[in-house]
Amino acid sequence: MKIAVLTSGILPVPAVFGGAVENLIDYYIEYNNQKKLHDITVYSIAPPKSSHIVDTTNTHYHYIDTTSFWGRLKRHIYVRSHSSTYYNPYIEYFLYESLKDIAKKDYDIIILENRPGYAIPVSKVSKARIIIHLHNDLLNKNSKDAKEICKVCDKVITVSNYIKSRVETIGAEIPIETVYNGIDLERFYQATPIDRKTLGFKEDDFIVVYSGRLIKEKGIEELIDAFIQLKDYPSIKLLILGGSFYGISQNNPFLDTLKKKCETIKNQIVFTGFIPYELLPNYLKVGDVAVVPSMWEEPFGLTCVEAMAAGLPLITTNTGGIPEICKNAVHVIDKKEINNLLYLQILSLYKDSPTLNKLGKIETFDKNVYAHSFLNSIK
């Protein structure tokens, strides 16, 4: 089949700048190239010229220039002369330019990656089947034009049953299928841990790993509060991957609060700052346990999968799609009771470390299983 993939219009594909959705696109493109299944054209903003990205027999890239002088000028003219209809004008410029090419092509399927708002404009220029690949809670009974979007689409593929249940609130007669995300498990299995001493830890420290941004929704404040309760256990340490207070110049009251709280336990916390994704497995494996204390409704919980793939026992919350992703493998606590339960759970694992390996054996999510399932679901 001839397939078009419309990306978010924010980050390029291939995922030279990272991005969870962009990485997942790369996985099924890579799998499709190996199996030679479909002719796929990816519509994306242009990556840096130094990336040396080339088409293959089965994959073609149609890039929208948003960074050169002429690209920025064209986008500026569009933004000044058009009002937004669904997304911000920069995303809608990307869609506008992509549709000019799509209208000339004869695709069988057009996949909308996490952009349900693309559906109606796409339906006006193409007779292809439209499939939404939904990574977040962006299509439910309260979403703009929800019923109209479902009418022009042929299917919705969701990353979890939680997201599926949110789409079902619309009450539309449209097929909805869950295909779980995947990661490169071999990269996590084969990774060698970073030397603890280079991070300032002792060999006998009990290291709790948090991977993610320093934002309220991710539960980082609740985790720091738990460590304040654990300050009488100096060998329990917190390793924060990817997050840092440094280099953030804008006024941020939430980060200011975190800074003040961290002062009381500064000898128990290490911030790594930015870490390239390819090194994440090496850093995760430094830990004894991972904590994903999400306080919002996680659509999937990719961070949980990464921790489990690294062989770490996991403490997380009962939010969104996390319980279905992590069943039988982790300690799931009620987010309403997190202030009472999180430090107790960390302390319990610290005192009962012989059980850690047993707790770390869990079901896994492989990128090739994901890619195979996803490409099967669009038939």
Q: Locations of the language-model features?
A:
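Short hydrophobic beta-strand element within catalytic cores of glycosyltransferases
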Residues: 313-316
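Acidic anion/phosphate-binding donor-loop and adjacent secondary structure
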Residues: 142-145, 165-168, 183-198
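Acidic donor-binding loop of glycosyltransferase active sites
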Residues: 285-299
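A charged, aromatic-enriched C-terminal amphipathic alpha-helix characteristic of glycosyltransferases
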Residues: 89-93, 337, 351-379
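Conserved donor-binding/catalytic core segment of Leloir-type glycosyltransferases
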Residues: 157, 202-218, 224-227, 239
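Nucleotide-activated donor-binding/catalytic signature segment of Leloir-type glycosyltransferases, i.e.
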Residues: 124, 252-275
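Glycosyltransferase donor-sugar binding loop
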Residues: 237-256
